[in-house]
Amino acid sequence: LTDFYQIIHHVPASPSVRTLMQGWLIPKHFQGQLRMQEGITVNGHYLPMSAPVPADATVALHYQAPMPTIAPAPGATDIVYEDEQLLAINKPAGMKTHPNKASDTDTAIARIGQYLGQPAFITHRLDMATSGILLVAKDPLSQAIINRQLATKTAARTYTAMVDAAIPDCGTIDAPIGHMGNDTRRREVRSDGLPAVTHYQVLTRNAAYALVRLVLETGRTHQIRVHLAHIGFPIIGDPLYNQTPGPRMYLHATEMTLTRPFAPAQLKISCPPTDFMV
């Protein structure tokens, strides 16, 4: 276990330490650990969870958690956002988010670890063939806060894809997704699958292709890829769901909206694709 310290300045008044923790979306198991170890101090003094927090206080959190063990790897990282708790990069297509086997040494998370000088904490994943915003946390508490926002849909991700020009202007794809037979990689729409909903809108189009904005209500594996293929408009270059090959799969994580850990401010991270041919 590694010791972590979180110091938050200029905290607004709160009826109790517990209310403050809940407002920060700190998971209950972290709250329990902080309470048991007296790891919460307000203006330098320990306060019980029921005690009020004065205005403009400095709150320090001390806790222990495992440190990720992914080894750092040298390589360029295209950083699109960074603050004290979070880092977002523009992941290139063709790079894995994290290693799946021992030989996977050059991954996005390994390069981020090299840049930070410490391992990063994963909050979500992108398929190897998908480019765009990949957000990590610099500490386990911020990771837990972002994961909770993603799970409760208070954080939102927007994608851009390139498909055949004939796709309708907009639509909602509400179709359950499950494994394709015994294939461990591929998914398909099937009645016994998990619920999956994708909204799409055409942004622009030319004679050959349409640029489509996509918002997910659910987060199934390959959801966008499977849903677009299901309605007859697979992503251009998709190696699993489009029989026509391309130079890359034209799917990009374009935008992410969330609440910053330990701050009331909404954060919007944007990273438009630069190589889509529309």
Residues of each region from the PLM?
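RNA pseudouridine synthases
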Residues: 1-278
